[in-house]
Amino acid sequence: MSKAKCIMVQGTMSGAGKSLLCAALCRIFAQDGWRVAPFKSQNMALNSFVTRDGLEMGRAQVVQAQAAGVEPDVRMNPILLKPSSDIGSQVIVNGEVRGQMPAAEYFRRKKQLIPDILAAYNSLAEDFDIIVIEGAGSPAEINLKADDIVNMGLAKLVDAPVLLVGDIDRGGVFAQLFGTVELLEPDERARIKGLIINKFRGDVGILRPGLAMLEEKTHLPVFGVVPYLKADIEDEDSLSDRLQVKNAVKPLDAAIVRLPHISNFTDFMPLEQHPLLGVRYVQTTRELGAPDCVILPGTKNTVDDLLWLRQCGLEAAISKLAQRGTPVLGVCGGYQMLGQTLADPEGTESGRPQTLRGLGLLPTQTTFAAEKRRTQSQATVTAEPFAGAHLTGYEIHTGRTTVQGAPLCTLADGTPEGCVQGQVFGTYLHGLFDSGELTEQFAAYLCRRKGIDPAAAAPISMQEYRTQQLDLLADGVRHNLDLAAVYAAMGLAQPAERGNDQ
C-alpha cells in the first residue's frame, strides 16, 4: 500500500486558526473523495476524549477526525499534555498516562518521544491517502527550536510541505508572516509552500498591495485570504473564549463554575445551543447570583479546586442554593466535590496524603488512586425527572466513588452510575448532553420549575448541528483558498469534479 501524502499547517502564533483550518482541509479532502486523517504530534489541552478502545487524546484531533468522517484514533495525537498546575502537566503517550512531569523536565526529555510520534504517523500513513498535520504555536520560537517535535522538527521528520497561516484579526499580519519566515533556517523556509491570511473582515481588495509586497519580500505565494468565519466549532482557543461569557441572555440561566483547573467543558456546548438555555461561567459569589441551575464541571485537580471553591465562598453559596431547591449538577471532578469526603491516601491528586470533606450534597465517598479509568459508556437514566433518557458518554478519572444513595443512571452492562439526592445530581459521564434526549429533558425540567413552556424550543441534534457547522467551515475555506496550489504542494492534482469555486 502506498504511503499517504501530507500537508502541514503551521501558524505565526497560538490562536492563528491552525486547528480550524486543519478541520476545514480534512472536510474538503474527504468531500473530494480522499481517505483523510488529522495528526498532531503533541497537543496541550484541557479538554480530552476517550476513544472506542479506551485511550485518551486531544479533542482538536477528534473534531478534525469528525470533519474527515473517520473514527477518532489515538494515533492522530500520540502525545497529549494536560496541565495540572502552573508548572507541570500530566503526560499521556499513545493514550496512556506516563505520569506527572514539570515543564522543565518534559522539555529535557521530549525528544525521547520521537519514536512514538513516528510510529503513530507512519501507521496512519499506511491507512489513509492524505494526512493533515497541525503544528503548535509558532515555528519561530527561538528558545524551543532545538528540541522541536511539533513544528519544523516534525516537518523534517515526515518530509511535510508547510502552509504558514497568520491571524489578521489581531493586527500586524504582514509582520507576523514576514518575521516568522525570516527567523527560520533556509531549509525550513524551503518547506513553506504558501502563506494564508486568516480571519479577514472586509474588502479583500484593500489587501492587494500588501499581499504583493509580502510575496515579493518572502518569495512565497499567498494561497488565500480566509474570511472570519462564523462556524461554531470547538477548538482550544475558541473554547477559552466561551469561559468569558458572564451573562445569560435566554429565559433559563445555567451557571457553570469556572474552576481554576476546569477541563472538558466541551460537555456543555449542547446546552449553549439550546434556544432557551443561557450558559455562563462564574468565578465569584456575586457572579453566581441566583441561577436556575448550578453546574460543577470536570477539573484536572479536584482537591485544589475544592479548596479554591471553599476559600472564595462559592462552596457556601452553592450549598445555600441547593438548600433552597436550586438544581445542582456535578460532572466528574464536580461530582466528586458534591460528596461527603474525598480521600487521597497516596497523594495521587494533591501531592500529599490527605482527606477532605466535600460539599456534602450527595451521599458519596471518593478515594483517589493512581490508576485512571478511561472508557466509553452507554447509559439509561433511571432517576426522575430524566428517567428513560438514553445517553452516550465517556469516563476519564482516577477517583473511585462509593455511593450510598440512588444512582443517576444504569450503564449498558447493568452497573449503576452516578448519584442523585433531591435536586442534586452527579455523574462521571462526559459528553452526557450530546444526547438530545437528556438535553431536552434537562431543559424541560428547568422550564417547568420556572413556568416556561418547553414546547417553545425546537433544537436540532448536536450531531446534525456539528455537521452543518463543519460544512459551513469547509465551504468558507474552499471558496477562499487556492486548493489547486494546496494539492500541488502535496504532489497531487485537484479532483476535477469539485473544482475550486473562487
Predicted features, each with a name:
Residues 348-375:
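Conserved P-loop NTPase catalytic core
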Residues 1-322, 327, 344-347, 370-371, ...:
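Flexible phosphate-sensing "switch/lid" loops adjacent to ATP/NTP-binding sites
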Residues 337:
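Conserved catalytic-site region of short-chain dehydrogenase/reductase
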Residues 332:
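Catalytic nucleophile serine of serine hydrolases
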